[in-house]
Amino acid sequence: MAATAWGIRSSGIRGASPVMSACVSPAEVILGADHQQQMYCHLLCGLRRWDAVDCIRAPYAAALARALRLLQSKWRQLCDDLECGTVCADVVTDAAMRGAVQDGVLAGPCPELAGRVRRICERDDWRGVLRQLWPDARYISCVTTGTMEQYFPAIKHFAGEALPVLGTDYLASECAIGINLERTSPPEETTYVLLPRAAYFEFIPFDMDAAGRGAAAAEPVDIAGVEAGKTYELVATTFRGLYRYKVGDVVKIAGFHHSSPRLQFVTRAPPPQEHGEVLTERDVMAAMDTFQLMLKDGGEVIEFAAFIIDGDGGQRRRRCATIAVEVSNGSKLLDHERSAAFLRRCTAPLEGCLGGAYRLSRATGDVAPLEVAVVRPGTFDRLAEAAIRGGAPANQYKPPRSSGTGTSSMCCNPPWCAAAAQSLNQLLTSICLIVSLNQRQFLDRESNSGTDKVFISDSILNFQHWGGFSLRFDLQEESLTLYKDHPS
């Protein structure tokens, strides 16, 4: 989805931006620099102007899920602000943003409205809470396919049965690709009718062979050469000058609408250097669905990411797959003594969800046993904030899902890799427990002179990572040290 401020800054016939006039938040909030403060102000403005909200929109489901988590954690403060008619300076430090909301939207205390919001939010069950807060809302609209699919159940829970969650069209930064003719379909059934005149599209046949390695045919086919049921990597030649550009998406031809193919998103295509990797986004998502079922009432999976660290040829000759999981605050998994045994029981079923490529690599000994890491609550939100501060557009940020090796970026946003390159570092420094099939454990970290050490039960490796920081596994002291710069 292309990122542009044209729709917000441009003026319509009457001199006002058509996009800005459709929002309940003032321009100072929409164009603000701090994402967390923006979300808080959006929620506050939406609650104050509750009778003017007729739909809830977000570019991606991940952004809407973050806003809902903020509503869950800050609803009491939001009610206090509504009751007093002020914006808490500790939460919103941006003076322009705070002043615009306080003077232009709140316009004085609203004790009755604050009481109404309190009565709705103080319930234990938040099913259908969005419909109760905004009874005139007709629908929720956001991207819920691909890696966004994991957020759909939570959003649907908050929306309830009476408030539909609609899918959006298939838009990329390079060009428009397809339109969604059945917007009420659940993510797993969503298809897009290709727009044949939006660009010149070609399709590279894509196959996950017996080893799970992406195998692409040398010659692409055009729109007339695709076959229903086959999987392809999408290529576009655009009117703006991109020639045979690989969009990076793998799609399945679900059928045809008249003569236009109906596309079903499958996964992101692995980068060229990672063809042959053992983890795909869909594999990891399937594993996390299983993990959530195993948790039952022991907590909720908030976010997750998977990465593979290469062996060094020494003590650790094999690559190691790790899935970092953030669970809801108060989860039993945050209790080390109770969770270690549970995680060990989980690793074997999770390995069974990781696809043929991973299972083959495990059988041949190329990959070490799976490690499941529990990171501290809020880790992925801090990761998002770091990426946004580093230049990632807030409305386009996608949480990392999987990376092939320890020498590649975990984040799905190539233009701002400088910030994304620190994602593995931030995940590792937030780890409170890692358990694998071979009984290795990473316990609480301790900070000392700018380095973070995670004590482990056996020695692993010494290995340097991306530019800007490195990892050193001390084989004698049985400790792991993360350096912000390469150690001497």
Swiss-Prot record:
Where on the tree of life does the source sit, at the highest rank? Answer: Eukaryota
Q: Which UniProt keywords apply?
A: Ligase
A single GO CC term for this protein reads: cytoplasm
| GO biological processes | response to auxin; response to light stimulus
Supply one GO molecular-function term: acid-amino acid ligase activity
**Induction record:** At low level by auxin.
The record's EC number reads 6.3.2.-
According to its UniProt record, in which tissues is this protein expressed? Answer: Expressed in roots and callus.
Sorted alphabetically, which PANTHER family does this protein's record hold? GH3 DOMAIN-CONTAINING PROTEIN, INDOLE-3-ACETIC ACID-AMIDO SYNTHETASE GH3.6-RELATED
Family of the protein in this entry: Belongs to the IAA-amido conjugating enzyme family.
Q: What does this protein do?
A: May catalyze the synthesis of indole-3-acetic acid (IAA)-amino acid conjugates, providing a mechanism for the plant to cope with the presence of excess auxin.
Q: What is this protein called?
A: Probable indole-3-acetic acid-amido synthetase GH3.6
Gene (UniProt): GH3.6
